[in-house]
Amino acid sequence: MERSNRKTRIGRVVSDKMEKTIVVAVEGKVRHPLYGKTINRSKKFKVHDENNEARINDRVLIMETRPLSKDKRWRLVQIVEKAK
């Protein structure tokens, strides 16, 4: 699999309590199939953070990768915006 074809997401760090792992919540808007109302949905991903550089509330870019553990299939590419 080429790196250019891997999925990327931008999300917010919701937990950094694990060693070399962060939890990132990715927000998205979905239209309800029957009523048409726009609903906010979020999904949490466990992300590999090799250098423990991301902190809570940082906006980060993550990329799909090979399975690194039971739950981790994403890795940190860059920190888009640091938390204030």
Curated annotation (Swiss-Prot):
GO BP, sorted A to Z: translation
InterPro entries: NA-bd_OB-fold, Ribosomal_uS17, Ribosomal_uS17_bact/chlr
Database matches in Pfam families: Ribosomal_S17 (PF00366)
Gene Ontology molecular function: rRNA binding; structural constituent of ribosome
Assembly, per entry: Part of the 30S ribosomal subunit.
Family classification: Belongs to the universal ribosomal protein uS17 family.
Role this protein plays: One of the primary rRNA binding proteins, it binds specifically to the 5'-end of 16S ribosomal RNA.
Protein name: Small ribosomal subunit protein uS17
Organism: Clostridium novyi (strain NT)
Organism taxonomic ancestry: Bacteria, Bacillati, Bacillota, Clostridia, Eubacteriales
